[in-house]
Amino acid sequence: MAGADVDVGTELRLGLPGGGGGAAEAAAKAAKRGFEETIDLKLKLPTAGMEEAAAGKAEAPAAEKAKRPAEAAAADAEKPPAPKAQAVGWPPVRSFRRNIMTVQSVKSKKEEEADKQQQQPAANASGSNSSAFVKVSMDGAPYLRKVDLKMYNSYKDLSLALQKMFGTFTATGNNMNEVNGSDAVTTYEDKDGDWMLVGDVPWQMFVESCKRLRIMKGSEAIGLAPRAKDKYKNKS
């Protein structure tokens, strides 16, 4: 068999120069290509077919990415437009309406001030007519009473009311003989904290300055009358 191969390789053939070697060259190239591909596969190198397949796969994602923006734009075009928010202060207020609103606000302020001024005298009047309750105590009595001084118009009215409350005679006045001869005398504490006899000042001054009343023994109230006189003389 080896001899036959040698004969084929060394066999002389008839033909044009260079025309007889075409088949041999093609066979040699095919054998070389097969040898190179075998080596590439063993070394895990990419062959020509593998490179073409990879290029095809790379082109497919690029085409899909190019399609996505176009599809998103088409979907946005199909959506209805969002409603526009109404601007604050729209529609604009005309000038004459604005002037009317300004005049109304000024009028309301003036009316409020007028109402306050009208209410102020009424509040003062009600305050002046308010009650003036004071406590009344009597030495030896086991209870206290309260009287509204503004319910009486004079010392005489107050004395009669106290007699009904405590059932005893109470002297009011700055006469020392009256104080000495009475069993009980009505005194009061003023705003300064001083104790004085009831009746030693004008009635209205007494009502404004009295804090509380006390019915005490006449012997204990002897020194109060002169002190009350001196006090109000100095004030006058």
UniProtKB/Swiss-Prot annotation:
UniProt main location, coarse: nucleus
Signal peptide feature range: none
Record text on subunit structure and interactions: Homodimers and heterodimers.
UniProt name for this protein: Auxin-responsive protein IAA13
Residue ranges, annotated region (Disordered): 1-24, 52-93, 105-130
Organism of derivation: Oryza sativa subsp. indica (Rice)
CC per GO annotation: nucleus
Entry comment describing in which tissues the protein is expressed: Highly expressed in etiolated seedlings. Expressed in roots and flowers.
Database matches in Gene3D superfamilies: Phosphatidylinositol 3-kinase Catalytic Subunit, Chain A, domain 1 (3.10.20.90)
Pfam families attached to this UniProt entry: AUX_IAA
Cellular location(s): Nucleus
BP terms from Gene Ontology: auxin-activated signaling pathway; regulation of DNA-templated transcription
Segments forming domain PB1: 131-218
Compositional bias segments (type: Basic and acidic residues): 62-81
